[in-house]
Amino acid sequence: MRILVFLWLGLSSLFAVDATLEVVKKFANMPSIIVEDSSTREVERGLTLRVYKMLVGDLKVSSHFNVQEGGASSFDMVMDYGAYRQKKVDLVAKVKAGREGSGILAELRLYDVNSGDSVFAKSYTVAREDRYPFVAHKMAIDINNYIKAPSIDWMNRFVVLSKYTAPSESQIVVADYTLTFQNVIIKDGRLNIFPKWANEQQDAIYYTKYLTKPTLFRYNLYTGESRKITESEGMLVASDVSADGKKLLLTMAPHTQSDIFLFDTQTGTRKQLTRYPGIDVSAHFIEDERRIMFISDRLGYPNVFATGLDGSETVEQMVFHGRNNNAASAFGQYIVYSSRESSNEFDTNTFNLYLVSTKSDYIRRLTANGVNQMPRFSQDGETVMYLKHNGAQSALGVIRLNYNKSYLFPLPSGKIQSMDW
């Protein structure tokens, strides 16, 4: 796992630290865990090492553990709890993995040093060897659940992204959050952009393909079927999907300038929600899908606004900091957005992420430099994923909001156009 780690700007947090306190209460301090390699056969060691390294990385990203890397220790060895206590270790995780057909069978045994007990022994299988990161992600989630820490279930979700492979050509890729696992699902020599998960199950996506007109397709990951949904002049992007999967928020430009439309996937009908003679893009459902948040240049520069679903065009400004806020995501009363902070005519501009509350004037900067765009909240609101660009290269960034830490996972080659998780 390739990780670049940064301390978050500032030591205070807009989000509550109750979650951290619950973990500390159970173990007196942040629990210390040591991960050990329990492979016994040479043929197991390479695969076990990959799962082991990924698990160590996952536990660090969770921010709920002090993580140590241990040596070899088979399942058959008698546990010397006293020796671990002297090293101030609270938990021991023993891992091994082997091939089973074309897939993997892995095992995890967790020991609680303080109680002197074997906590659990679990087996994990995946059908393909290249999916081994998800074995480690599931292990990390189970260990995290044992200490009753806030959920890290987001680690086991797929990320879908579009990456450029040549001029006017891009692929759609499904990956894990570290970009270690990658599976190309759309590759046809065309421009395929703006993938969006179609449902909570993550078994289908919407994406835009540039044909004679921008055309929206729905692709089923399990059957490989692509079905045309609609097309439009100018531009066409599916920016959000309702919880029941029946409604889409589309950015369309049927008459030169882009506006926001509500599309019914059952009937194929659409309703225009904005009619501004400028640019309205990137809408997202907010407030239990009673309203939408979107980006508009109606102040003379891009900013974040909200309006209802009734098409009344009554618009509310949501963000009052920054003069070029071009992307946003919402969770409850919080908005995370990307703001341009430089005006370089001949060089790359700086875009930083900010977190604000709609209930107060509190604001926090989440990134310090570079090009940071397309922020996305996790389902529990505790984590933000975003894109970081550096020249022709890209990385997925993960910010753990409660713990003042962020992580970068570089894409080995190519540049990410957009992503969803």
UniProtKB/Swiss-Prot annotation:
It comes from the Bacteria. Pfam families: TolB_N. The keyword Signal applies. Keywords: Cell cycle, Cell division, Periplasm, Signal. Residues 1-16 form the signal peptide. The keyword Glycoprotein does not apply. GO terms for biological process: cell division; protein import. GO terms for cellular component: periplasmic space. Disulfide bonds: none annotated. Gene3D superfamilies: TolB, C-terminal domain. InterPro entries: 6-blade_b-propeller_TolB-like, Tol-Pal_TolB, TolB_N. Its main location: periplasm. Part of the Tol-Pal system, which plays a role in outer membrane invagination during cell division and is important for maintaining outer membrane integrity. NCBIfam families: PRK04043.1 (NF003124). HAMAP family: TolB. The Tol-Pal system is composed of five core proteins: the inner membrane proteins TolA, TolQ and TolR, the periplasmic protein TolB and the outer membrane protein Pal. They form a network linking the inner and outer membranes and the peptidoglycan layer. Belongs to the TolB family. This is Tol-Pal system protein TolB. It comes from Wolinella succinogenes (strain ATCC 29543 / DSM 1740 / CCUG 13145 / JCM 31913 / LMG 7466 / NCTC 11488 / FDC 602W) (Vibrio succinogenes).
